[in-house]
Amino acid sequence: MFISFEGTEGVGKTTLIRKLYEHFEASGKQVVLTREPGGTPLAEQIRSLLLAVNHDEPMSSDTELLLMYAARAQHLQQVIVPALADEKLVLSDRFTDASYAYQCVGRGLSKDKLNTLNQTFVSHMPDITFWLDAPIELGMSRARERGALDRFEQEKVEFFQRVRQGYQQLHELYPERIKRLDATQAPEIVFQEALEHIQALV
C-alpha cells in the first residue's frame, strides 16, 4: 500500500507519519518511510537546492517544477516502485498532489505542464492521501517555532492561502483518495482518524 501525506507548512505531517510508522512496524508490517522532495541520496541533493534561500539568483517557478520532478522520478524508481513490488507499506511525506497545490495553484503554473510530467514520469499513485488542513497562520506559527525558515517557509501568507485552496480543489476532485484531516485537533485524534481510513482499505 502507498500512502502520501499533504498539507501546508507546520500542519503536523511529520508527527502523524511517525505515529503511523511506529504503529505498523509494531504490528510486524514492513514499512518504508520516505519524503519528497528527497528519499534517495540524489533526490536529497535536489531537495537542498529547492529549499535553499538564494537572494542572488531566485529560482524560477519552471525550474522549481522541473527539479521537483527530477527528484520524484529518482524517488519512484529507486524507492517507491521497488518497495511496492516487495509488498511493503510506503509512507511518503508529500507526492504529486504537492506539485499541483504549490507549483500550479501556488505559483500559477499551467496544469498542462503538470499533467505532461505526471503522464511521463509518474507510474504509481497513492492508494490513499491524507491532507492535513489547518489555518495558514497556525501552521506558519508552528514552522517559525522550529527555527530557521527554508525557501518555501519564507513565502507570504497569500501564497499559502493559494496552496491551501489547491489542496481543497484536489480533495473535491478525488474525495475517494484524498481524505481531509482537521490538523487543529490533538495529534492522537488525527492519528486515530487516519488509522480508521487505512483500516477501511485493508
Swiss-Prot record:
Catalytic activity: dTMP + ATP = dTDP + ADP
Enzyme class: transferase
InterPro entries: P-loop_NTPase (IPR027417), Thymidylate_kin-like_dom (IPR039430), Thymidylate_kinase (IPR018094)
Keyword check for Lipoprotein: no
Known EC number: 2.7.4.9
Highest rank taxon of the organism: Bacteria
GO CC list: cytosol
An individual GO BP term: dTDP biosynthetic process
Nucleotide-binding listed as a keyword: yes
SUPFAM superfamilies (UniProt xref): P-loop containing nucleoside triphosphate hydrolases
Residues that, per the record, bind ATP: G7, T8, E9, G10, V11, G12, K13, T14
Family that this chain belongs to: Belongs to the thymidylate kinase family.
Protein's job: Phosphorylation of dTMP to form dTDP in both de novo and salvage pathways of dTTP synthesis.
Alphabetized PANTHER family for the sequence: THYMIDYLATE KINASE, UMP-CMP KINASE 2, MITOCHONDRIAL
Name of the protein this chain belongs to: Thymidylate kinase
